Amino acid sequence: GAIIYLTYYMQNHFGYSPLKSGVVFLPMVLALIATAIPAGRIIVPRLGARGTLPLGLAVLAGSFLIFSRMTTESTYEHVALPGLIVFGMGLGLTMPVTFNSGTRGVDAKRTGLASAILSAAQQIGGSFGVALMTSYATQHAEDYVTDHAAQVKAAAMEAMMRAQALPQSPAGKQIVETLKAQLIDRAQIEAYSGGFTMMAWILAGAVAVLVVCGIG
């Protein structure tokens, strides 16, 4: 779910094209690769799955907390870039141990089947994540617009009075449209920020469960 809403953030807030939105995710991919290699060779042999998976989830939770700091004034370098790097590091820690644990002890003839099941589970989990984020973001954005509608209306009336423009005049319509667009932008970013905070808490809970109960 994080990737989808980060893409929306890049395109809707920054005005990036689909191509540029894909390019700005490259630091995440590089961080994933740079972390996965030492994770498989050094971290997993030392900590085992019991230690590496909670560590990776904690790093992912940290990336969501970074994303949750986004505001209408945030730049790509201020929030998105560091968040993407940390997110890639978290994926680099969790992916090797997840697939290794999922196929460990499986007969060689059934390794392909086990990998397919893991991939399917990953896709299903991603779908649930998207559904959860969508539900939260939609409701949060609607609530934000409702709570701030009167404030925006008052700001529009004040701006039209200063500009000596009527609501139906071209200048008045431009003022209204500008303030409405700003309200929608703020509502979306507030929704995304809250959604990332929620996901960080969910992952923190998962880390706590893994640490307390242990994993195989």
Range-by-range predicted roles:
Residues 99-101, 105, 117-215:
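Hydrophobic transmembrane architecture of multi-pass small-molecule transporters
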Residues 1-113, 216:
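Transmembrane core module of solute transporters
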